[in-house]
């Protein structure tokens, strides 16, 4: 039997909003972080450079506050239902920090691959920035014959290249040109995405 793994980007793919601008609103700089997020998704700034900068800025927000903000973030109900119907085959693959998003991934109800960080005395230190391509290889090595990747930004390109099938998803906003260029399918609606996933 063919075993398929489904790898989902988190921000703006599974969630109905981008997470980091929501955290930035606590500091009154949501527009600035949204701009930084956008130029990163467009590939104008490397994900590593952008993440280090965003962590340095947003690390000022207490973890408890971050968890409260993320707890209020909605997940696309159609994608959530798809994942919950096959949790052992689904994975969140996000460059976001484990200490910020682990509770959200638990709520989604599947495995997750994240960037790693520690928090000590109110200071966040990055330990490891996730390589999405390596995450897909790691997931494949768990005994999956096929990997389908779903994302929306240029930072999803390594995941798309390592997968067998790549889907650029525009659920929250249009997928970036780099993601579209590496994709096999482009979908703009959660219902359409679930139908496609069920037929692949």
Predicted regions and their residues:
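Alpha-helical substrate-recognition element adjacent to the catalytic core
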Residues: 2-120
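C-terminal cap/substrate-recognition subdomain and adjoining C-terminal extension
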Residues: 77-200
